[in-house]
Regions:
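Hydrophobic or amphipathic, alpha-helical segments that drive membrane association/targeting
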Residues: 1-109, 153-210, 214, 238-244, ...
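Catalytic Zn2+-binding segment of zinc metalloproteases
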Residues: 139-158, 226-229
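C-terminal capping/extension segments of zinc metalloprotease domains
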Residues: 218-237, 241, 245-324
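Active-site recognition of the HExxH zinc-binding catalytic motif
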Residues: 56, 80, 118, 133-141, ...
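Active-site scaffold of zinc-dependent metalloenzymes
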Residues: 104-127, 145
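Short pre-active-site segment immediately N-terminal to the catalytic Zn-binding motif
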Residues: 68-69, 120-133, 204
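Short alpha-helical functional segments enriched in proximate histidine and acidic residues
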Residues: 83, 141-142, 196, 223
């Protein structure tokens, strides 16, 4: 794992690239097509802001979360309050998501406040020490304002996506009427340019998401005693258990809707387990974790990581173990 300073610089540079490329291309498009695209951009921004405000209610419905009282799970509240105090933030609301996949996520908006949700699958998979490390990771996301930052970073590619498809459909309309063929060709060109920019910005946004996962991991290590080993063991158990759950249940596709929120990507769990299967899980925990430092990520795995919101599991575990 790179140093905290390098992580911050990499995240800042990536965000600057996303903003810079977006500003440049939007300026070029507006210079050709005029202010009509401002309406499209403003509409997309308003829709995304509305989505951000109401997203917690949607997440609660999809993942069947419920608020739990301090008397119901005092040990979880004690962990959350301690980690939040060490992190210097107000204790978020604690919720349980009634789903079998072992995972956790942080979310919230000005309408709901900050929340940390733990799945019932996680409670059945990890011990309290590992749960504390996972909570430390999620609180790190809240402290770093990752929900807001990633919403903003994802908004810019979305603008180009909708602009691109709007222009392409507009060009088809012109072609169908046999009018303004010159304008139709220009719309197609700018539309395809917008789609290309969308894909480029999406790759940058995914990279930013992976950096912020490392940043949240580092935060957990800083506020949880022995957090590096606890979180590494927790991640291994999450991957192994998630792969089994996804094989057992065929109707979990909808639970991936907000997978970027999770501490581990449930969609890659089966592949991640393949990566880990080279290890002997009957070994002691120390021997198991020590083995990860000797492995290399293959070229195919590096390519797959480019399109993931989360770091490759082997790279992530190595990064954690380097902090022990």
């Amino acid at each position: 794992m790179p140093s905290t300073l390098k992580l911050k610089l990499a995240m800042l540079a990536t965000l600057a690239l996303i903003i810079g490329i977006s500003t440049l291309v939007i300026a070029i498009i507006l210079s050709y097509l005029g202010a009509s695209l401002i309406i499209i951009g403003a509409t997309i921004i308003l829709v995304n802001l509305l989505q951000w405000l109401i997203a917690p209610y949607i997440i609660d419905a999809i993942y069947r979360t419920r608020k739990i009282s301090k008397s119901e799970r005092p040990e979880l509240y004690e962990i959350l309050e301690r980690v939040a105090a060490k992190s210097g933030i107000k204790t978020p609301e604690l919720r349980i998501a009634d789903i079998p996949i072992p995972n956790a996520f942080a979310y919230g908006s000005p309408l709901t406040g900050n929340r940390v949700a733990i799945t019932s699958g996680l409670l059945n998979t990890l011990n309290l020490d590992e749960i504390e490390a996972v909570i430390g990771h999620e609180v790190g996301h809240l402290k770093h304002r990752d929900v807001q930052i990633m919403m903003f970073a994802s908004l810019l590619p979305a603008i180009f996506y909708y602009i691109g498809y709007s222009l392409i459909w507009s060009s088809m309309y012109y072609s169908g009427r046999g009018e303004k063929r010159g304008n139709g060709g220009l719309l197609v060109l700018i539309g395809f340019l917008s789609i290309i920019v969308y894909w480029i910005l999406t790759l940058f946004t995914l990279y930013l998401s992976r950096l912020r996962e490392y940043y949240a991991d580092r935060h957990s290590v800083s506020v949880v005693p022995g957090g590096a080993k606890k979180l590494a063991l927790g991640l291994v158990k999450i991957v192994e258990s998630t792969a089994r759950v996804r094989v057992r249940y065929a109707n979990l596709g909808s639970l991936s809707s907000f997978k970027a929120l999770f501490i581990a990507d449930p969609d890659s769990a089966i592949n991640d387990l393949d990566y880990l299967s080279k290890y002997n899980f009957t070994r002691t925990e120390s021997e198991l974790l020590a083995k990860y430092l000797k492995q290399r990520v293959t070229f195919a795995e590096q390519i797959a990581e480019l399109f993931s919101t989360h770091p490759n599991i082997i790279k992530r575990l190595k990064a954690l173990l380097e902090l022990m």
